[in-house]
Amino acid sequence: MDNRIDQAIIWITVLALVTAPLFFSFFDFVAVFNEPKVVMLHFTSGLVAILWLWQIVLNRINSRSATENQLNWDLLSWVGRNPVRWALIAVGIWVFAQLASNLLSPLPIISFFGGDEARSGYNLYDSLSLTIIFASVAFRFRSFKTLQILAYTLVITGTIAAAYGIAQHFGWDAIGGNGGRTRVISSFGNTLNFGGYMVMAIPATLAFAYKKFNRDRTALVIVTLALALQISGIWFSGSRGPIVAAAVSIISFFVITASLGSKKEILKSLAMAAVATVITAIVGTLPSEHGDVGLQRVISIGNQFSAETSSTDIVGGLSGRFNIWESTLKMATQWDLPIEEPTANKLLRPLFGLGQDMYVYSFPLAGNPQTTLALVDHAHNYELQLLIEQGFVGFLAFVSSAVLLSLSVLVMVQRMRRSNNGIDTAGFLVLALSPAMLGKMVELQTGVARISDLAMNMALLGAAIAIYEVVNSRLSVEEPEQAASNTIKPSSINISASNQMVLGSAVLAAVLVTAIATSIFVSWDLRRLSASRTLAVGYEAPTVEERARTWAKVQAQAPERESFTFTLFEQYLSTAEQQHALGNTKEALRLLNIGRDMLLEYEQRDPLEHDTQIGLMRAATTMMVWGHLEFAQELGDRAIKQAE
């Protein structure tokens, strides 16, 4: 039973890592492009957590007959000089910072579930789900076999996504309707996320030059073609940050290869990379509507450092990011929110931030003046995003874990080099997973990560822990003297508990997590997915009456979905104005009041949402134009609130 649960957890984790990059609203089967990714992440991570806890319960039940079944755990002895275990401590602090950030949030419900489905990856629900994926890989993928499965997953999903992106570049996309885009998005919904995923996939695919296959030449040809597809994909994404990060990941790949392999092995991967690059160049010269967008974007990289502008408007490229970063750092000195809050909360803001998913609401308070209504919902730097939303505790915890895991790669490569084993299975795994992690860390400095690429990123962080433990254990067997010298004496930080106490705690945790996770998934994810499916089916109904019934049903199913609510409000407002122009004033008032009431209901959940406030001001303005001057005060109050 224990082994079956282990296998279930491993394959459910793999399912999460496949669906995060590849799932979306195929053939418009739901109304929101990336919703299937989010739902599957919540489902798989919840299932992993439930299985894991019940496995602990079963193990404790089975150990009742054992003579030594008491829990004894010495923290410092366990951590020792092991960098990845210190990284696990840092991740634990990071999770604590997220929980504290949510508790202190001015809008805890928004911080837990998120305000907008387009901002995935930063609310607590998404963050905890991603952390479970991280933990699953870190603790359950501790064998060469499971780590190879992870490497295969990254390469295969990256190749499929790249092939789809290339098809979009040349005008074909019968699946998602995104053919002929200037910069392709593949199955990700955003060019940056697609490019960010290729940053991880490219070095992992390069590593397969050293994988032993039964038919080496055929396999090498397939791997080279896969690499060519991935390089072409990131090229057609036109994402400068990911292209630079991919270069860093490739450089780190060859640095590690030079440390572990022979000249012949180095030349083998260099040749594969060269052939793949030539294929990419050929693909890039093929005629398409938008030409060679990759070349144009790469040439413009140098201009990003010399571009000067006196405008404070948010624009693309580095100048826009410098603008955002300047305002973000200003936010980290003020910690202002657009609502009044208790003094105690204000004092804790530097430690635990403004609250998860709160960046978008506070940015206008520190941002430079804009000539347009440009909302910034991300710092375009992952660490700065964490700093603002999770404070210095969350920021330092994540940075510490990332630094420690990067250090673990260096330590591991040095030990492997001394062992003189060359690029064996362990070396292959280090090359497949470590440069991918390092390259992604670079990409996060200018990217806008979402769960489509964050899921694999978290898996790679977990893999850094797993592979270090596996390789370190193997090398310790080969170097027993050094292993003995690394033994840490017992410390005073020791946790002891009887098996009965551990069993009772595990049962309580398993029951609570099962009930809470199931309840949240059914009441939140499935309900919203059902509403999205209803809208997708009825969106193009043949009659106005059928479409109206569809929208009414969707609104009743998911009144908290701002994108649905605001779109429906605009429909009511437009129809009301048409009816008023035709002289049907009563019908016009009825329709406008229905739309206004929807926004007022949504305002109770999220009083800071920008579109909602704009919509309510438009409703008040329309009422005044129609002669209802009693809305003048409301309009004035809302206008002042928005200006402030």
How should each PLM-predicted stretch be described?
Residues 63-68, 106-109, 169-181, 298-299, ...:
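Peri-membrane helix termini and adjoining interfacial loops of integral membrane proteins
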Residues 22-36, 108-117, 175-187, 306, ...:
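Juxtamembrane membrane-water interface segments that cap and precede transmembrane helices
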Residues 222-223, 227-230, 534, 550, ...:
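Alpha-helical solenoid repeat scaffolds, predominantly canonical TPR units
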Residues 190, 310-376, 383, 390-397:
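TM-adjacent membrane-interface loops and short helices in multi-pass inner/ER membrane proteins
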Residues 1-118, 132, 136-156, 208-226, ...:
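Transmembrane signal-anchor hairpin modules in multi-pass inner-membrane enzymes, especially those
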